[in-house]
Amino acid sequence: MQSIAKLRAARISAQKARLVADQIRGKHVNDAVEILTFSQKKAAAIILKVLNSAIANAENNEGADIDELHVAEIQVGEGMTMKRFRARAKGRGNRICKRTSNIFVRVQER
């Protein structure tokens, strides 16, 4: 049994979110939740919500046993980039890129 959860346009850059995703890839679900709970990174809280959603999907939709689940796949890709303007000296302006990411989590029974 496998179950997925997706989050699109999360307000964190994909590069920063991948650092956290690499820590839980292939781990047992309980271990992954523990790692994310005690991590100080902003991405950990976002990925924890997606992981909990995938666990709930597996339990409610598939009838899976939570103790048998592990993180089979986690992907973090670049989402859309919001372009903003910052005023600079002498009437100039610079572009600010606010990056987003798409997070995909698949949990599966071993």
From Swiss-Prot:
Q: Which UniProt keywords apply?
A: Ribonucleoprotein, Ribosomal protein, RNA-binding, rRNA-binding
User: Entry's InterPro entries?
Assistant: Ribosomal_uL22 (IPR001063), Ribosomal_uL22_bac/chlpt-type (IPR005727), Ribosomal_uL22_bac/org-type (IPR047867), Ribosomal_uL22_CS (IPR018260), Ribosomal_uL22_sf (IPR036394)
Q: Which GO terms describe its molecular function?
A: rRNA binding; structural constituent of ribosome
Q: Which GO terms describe its biological process?
A: translation
Q: Which GO terms describe its cellular component?
A: cytosolic large ribosomal subunit
Protein purpose: This protein binds specifically to 23S rRNA; its binding is stimulated by other ribosomal proteins, e.g. L4, L17, and L20. It is important during the early stages of 50S assembly. It makes multiple contacts with different domains of the 23S rRNA in the assembled 50S subunit and ribosome. The globular domain of the protein is located near the polypeptide exit tunnel on the outside of the subunit, while an extended beta-hairpin is found that lines the wall of the exit tunnel in the center of the 70S ribosome.
> According to its UniProt record, which protein family does this protein belong to?
Belongs to the universal ribosomal protein uL22 family.
Q: What is this protein called?
A: Large ribosomal subunit protein uL22
Organism whose genome encodes this protein: Dichelobacter nodosus (strain VCS1703A)
Q: What is the lineage of its organism?
A: Bacteria, Pseudomonadati, Pseudomonadota, Gammaproteobacteria, Cardiobacteriales
